[in-house]
């Protein structure tokens, strides 16, 4: 939701769509109004890149990049691009060589920047989903090299980049994946910066309840949906749950996924346990939703690990079973 909102605020594809933000705090400042719809934006997600081999993973990433190029085929019109650049543009496909694929986002940035006369914003959602699958399925080293090459080209050696936002759900030492991105700022759930930006605050939720004539249900909503802490900011609510509650005006589990619980006997050593933990995180299996669906508490395991590169720091890790 956050990435979609950022795209719609900045993207030239949503120019003259300021009404989407009318009535919101950001629209009270003219300097922010003047930014709406003024940047070329490259938005992509790796959320569905869940392959079992290196070859199919790269092919899926190439497919996503190909769709980006197809969405911007207007760049081929006229004389903006040289014949060599047009040839490169047309070479983008699911089966393109890796050396072409790793430069594709960088070069699309250049083409868009030339067309609009402005640097681009890149939004990459769930950058780490392919890496989780690579670790679980044994092709981490291969994918790490490919990913580092692509990210270095897109996010470091890219003079056409205004700024970028990448989101992920696993905490990995920056030097393991982004050793070349020394200008990267890592924001986690323990960071104070932006602590109120990735969820609804209690004040916002209660104001919404009052606006919808549901102020008498504040305690009920708090007991169900007040479950997140970012930095030192407590009482952060899941936006999707609150939006659905306001729409349906009744309590319900609006944020969950189908879950398969792995038997503890299937975990023969620490490596199996770590893999199970990563799979659980990737599938968004949360304790509250598992209990809600009737899974016995004794079948649910809570994982806590600290990672340094590809090594697990045993002393800082706990496994509660």
Residue map of PLM features:
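Residue-level signal for secondary-structure boundary sites
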Residues: 52, 175, 267, 292, ...
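Active-site proximal loops enriched in glycine and acidic residues that flank catalytic Cys/His/Asp
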Residues: 168, 268, 304-306
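Domain-level recognition of nuclease-like catalytic cores that cleave nucleotide substrates
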Residues: 289-321
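A short, hydrophobic secondary-structure junction motif
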Residues: 33, 45, 280-286, 307-314
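Phosphate-binding site recognition
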Residues: 1-265
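Mg2+/Mn2+-dependent nuclease catalytic core
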Residues: 136, 141-146, 266-286
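Metal-dependent nuclease catalytic cores in nucleic-acid-processing enzymes
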Residues: 150-157, 280-302
